[in-house]
Amino acid sequence: MNLQGRTVLVLGLGETGLSMAKWLFRRGALVRAADTRNEPPAMRAFNSLLPQAEVFTGSLAGRAFYGVDLIAISPGLPLSEPLVQQALKEGIPVVGDMELFACAVGGTGGGMPKLVGITGSNGKTTVTAMTGAMLKKAGWDVEVAGNIGPAVLDALMRREDTGKMPQAWVLELSSFQLETTKSLGLDAAAVLNVSEDHLDRYAGMQEYAAAKARIFLGDSEGVQILNGDDPVVRQMTLAGRPHVTFSLATPQSADDFGLLREGGDTWLMQGDTRLMDARELAITGRHNCANALAALALCRALAVPFEPLLQALREFRGLPHRVEKVAAFSGITFYDDSKGTNVGATVAALKGLGQPVVLIAGGDGKAQNFSPLAAPIGEHGRAVVLIGRDAEKIAVAINECGVPLHRAQTMEEAVRKSFQLAREGDAVLMSPACASFDMFDNYVHRAEAFVAAVRSMQAARAGGNSAGVAGRH
C-alpha cells in the first residue's frame, strides 16, 4: 500500500489511533484526525507528532472527511457511523491497524515471519500470551501484539527501528479489529469460542460471529484452529483448508486435541497420545485446559516440537484479573475475574473453580441475554450479589436459579455481603459478566476496587475483628 502523499483521516485518538497516525506519517501520508471525544487521550501526543495537522473533536463533522483518500479507523468506532458509511459508498477505503500491518508485512518472502492470530469471546488474551510464551520457550524470536497490547503498529515500528523482524507475530484480534481486516493471511488462526458479547454494537449473534470468522480471510492456506465443542465455531470450517479442533472431550482424530479422563486423572491429549497431566498446569479450571489445548494446536501448526511447549505450559502462571486468586482467609478464597466482561466468561469461571461460589456480578450488560447464567449458578452458586446498572436485568434473567440474590450499591458493600454469605471452603468470585463503565473507569479499576475491599476486610480480620466463619452461619 503506497501511502506517500495520500490524505488519510485517522478516526479515534486512543492508543490504536495514535499508532496508526505515527505509522502513516512515517510512510509519508498527509494525516488528519477526528475523535468524538472533546479531549481524546492521545491528543497531546498527536499534536506533538504532527503540530500542523488538522484535528476535529466532538461530534464527527463532514469537513473532516473532505478530500480524504483513505480512512484509518480505530476499533472503538463502528463502521455503521453515518459519515463512515457515506465514505464507503463514495469508494473511500476504510482500514484498521491490522489491515495496515497486513499490507506492511505481506510478501516478505521466505515464509517468515509466521503470523499467528487468536480471537474469541473469551480466553483470547490468555491464549495469545500463552502461545507467545510457548514459542519463546522453543527458542523463537516472537512479538506478541494487538488487542493484548502493544498496538501492532507500535510493535512493528519498534522492530523496524532495530532492523530485526521476529520469526513469528502472535496477534490477539478483537471482532472490532477484524471488521476492517481482510488481508492478514495467517499461518495459524484460532477461534476459541463465540458467546453473546458486544450486542450493543452488532445486530445479533450472526453478525458478531461473522466478524470473528474474518480471521480466516486473506490469501492463505493457514491452519484453522477451531473449538470442537462450540457449534458456531465449527460452522466456520472452510472447505479445502487444513483444520484442527480442540475440545474438552476425547479427540476424534489423530490431529485433534482434547482431554482424556481416566480414574481421577485428566490428560491433555493429541489423538491417542497423552501429552501431560492437567494437574501439571500452573493455571486451574477446565477453561484453562481448553486454552492450553488451543495454544498447543497453534504452535504445532508451526511444526514446533512438543517438549518446550509442554514445559512452557507448566510454567505459565496466567494473567491478572482472569480468575486470579487475591486472598484466602477465614476458610474463604477470593478471586478477581474482572476481565470476565460477558456471560460466557462468567459461566466458564463458575464451572472451572470446582467449589461453591458466592458470585459478585453486574455492570453494563451490553444488551446481553443473561439467562445462560442461571444453570451454572444453580449448580455451583451459594449466593449472588448484584451490582451496577443492569443488576435488575440480571436478577430477572436468573430468578429461577435457586440461590439467594442480593443487591449492593458499591464494590465494598458487595465484598462485605459476599463474605457474610460464604461458608468455609467457598469461593467469592467477582466475575461481573458485564462491562465496567457504569461504575468504574475500566475493568482494571473495577479489579482494584475489589482487591482493596478484600484486603481491607482481611486486615480487619487479622487485627482481631474476627467472629470466625462458623459463627456467622
UniProtKB/Swiss-Prot annotation:
It is found in: Cytoplasm. InterPro entries: Mur-like_cat_sf, Mur_ligase_C, Mur_ligase_C_dom_sf, Mur_ligase_cen, MurD. The keyword NADP does not apply. The keyword Hydrolase does not apply. GO terms for molecular function: ATP binding; UDP-N-acetylmuramoylalanine-D-glutamate ligase activity. Pfam families: Mur_ligase_C, Mur_ligase_M, MurD-like_N. ATP binds at residues 120-126. Keywords: ATP-binding, Cell cycle, Cell division, Cell shape, Cell wall biogenesis/degradation, Cytoplasm, Ligase, Nucleotide-binding, Peptidoglycan synthesis. Its EC number is 6.3.2.9. Pathway: Cell wall biogenesis; peptidoglycan biosynthesis. It catalyses: UDP-N-acetyl-alpha-D-muramoyl-L-alanine + D-glutamate + ATP = UDP-N-acetyl-alpha-D-muramoyl-L-alanyl-D-glutamate + ADP + phosphate + H(+). Gene3D superfamilies: Mur ligase, C-terminal domain, Mur-like, catalytic domain, NAD(P)-binding Rossmann-like Domain. One of its GO terms (cellular component) is cytoplasm. GO terms for biological process: cell division; cell wall organization; peptidoglycan biosynthetic process; regulation of cell shape. Cell wall formation. Catalyzes the addition of glutamate to the nucleotide precursor UDP-N-acetylmuramoyl-L-alanine (UMA). Belongs to the MurCDEF family. This is UDP-N-acetylmuramoylalanine--D-glutamate ligase.
